[in-house]
């Protein structure tokens, strides 16, 4: 794989954010030793794949779409499917379990499939720093962030050094393969043990009733990126546009970083990752709030060749995601009155007159992933780990 070098990076305390790198070739080999690009050979990709677990969150997705995504992930990487699918009037989760079983057998690959609302999570998380994930119902709370964190814990329990995320609603299976290769390339070459790579979609298309239109950026991302960059510009007194991935669901990180940072609930999860880094390891650095200091956090942003194409979600979904994403900034120490005013103006333009919600947060530090997963899988009658 060949990627362009980022044109620049910017430093915010102990956070180093790189500008966008682009995939130049999915399967190319330069004739001479390159100095103007990053070349990762097949051996390096394979070595990194064995160190990576790919997490696939799913909720009521078309089974064929999910199957194509799972079959596109390199077999060297174990897969963790975290399902929040409905079980009535049809038990969609049971279909996902059977699909995972068949793929595990046919491809001879390790797949864990866990149900987000499995009651076994309650006992497994009890007494750990993550017990607040369980609500009054005795089940893990609803939300994408909660599902991503459960997937991270399972991946860490399976021995991963790196954890990558691939959405299950992707209609272009080849993009799941490309994302995986990007994760392997970026994290295997990272210079910090506390690293993350976030995907910048080259195009984001939605399948509507008529034609498909490919946008350069998603509607929510455009707003979130703008507010984050505006916020950083105020602090640095220099205008910046360094953040291109405020709502990047396709991402990967080192287990060391994932265990140290806080995780946001629901749709807040992707934006809150950046907010947490900047709050604690930029503004809070001198006050001793950055748990990874004197090390630094490295954030890479990479643009793939494949577009991200999924089903149309509707304006209501877009407004909800925007409000939740901006809420992570609004309720943080990053937000000056000027920033809060801009956020409220953005929400008013979407027909939302109230302050954005403050997300719940979870901190896994001090949790033993292997102990949690062993307890969970022993108690569960619904979730499975198909190992070969």
From Swiss-Prot:
Q: Which reaction does it catalyse?
A: (2R)-3-phosphoglycerate + GDP-alpha-D-mannose = 2-O-(alpha-D-mannosyl)-3-phosphoglycerate + GDP + H(+)
Question: Is Oxidoreductase set as a keyword in this record?
Answer: no
> Cellular location of this protein?
Cytoplasm
Q: Name one GO molecular function term.
A: mannosyl-3-phosphoglycerate synthase activity
EC number from the UniProt entry:
2.4.1.217
* Gene Ontology cellular component terms for the protein in this record: cytoplasm
Q: What is its main location?
A: cytoplasm
Which pathway or pathways does this protein act in?
A: Carbohydrate biosynthesis; 2-(alpha-D-mannosyl)-D-glycerate biosynthesis; 2-(alpha-D-mannosyl)-D-glycerate from GDP-alpha-D-mannose (MPG route): step 1/2
- Which GO biological process annotations does it have? mannosylglycerate biosynthetic process
Keywords, A to Z, come to:
Cytoplasm, Glycosyltransferase, Transferase
The UniProt family comment states:
Belongs to the glycosyltransferase 2 family.
Describe its function.
Transfers a mannosyl group from GDP-mannose to phosphoglycerate to form mannosyl-3-phosphoglycerate (MPG).
Protein name according to UniProt: Mannosyl-3-phosphoglycerate synthase
Native species: Aeropyrum pernix (strain ATCC 700893 / DSM 11879 / JCM 9820 / NBRC 100138 / K1)
Ranked from the top, the taxonomy reads: Archaea, Thermoproteota, Thermoprotei, Desulfurococcales, Desulfurococcaceae
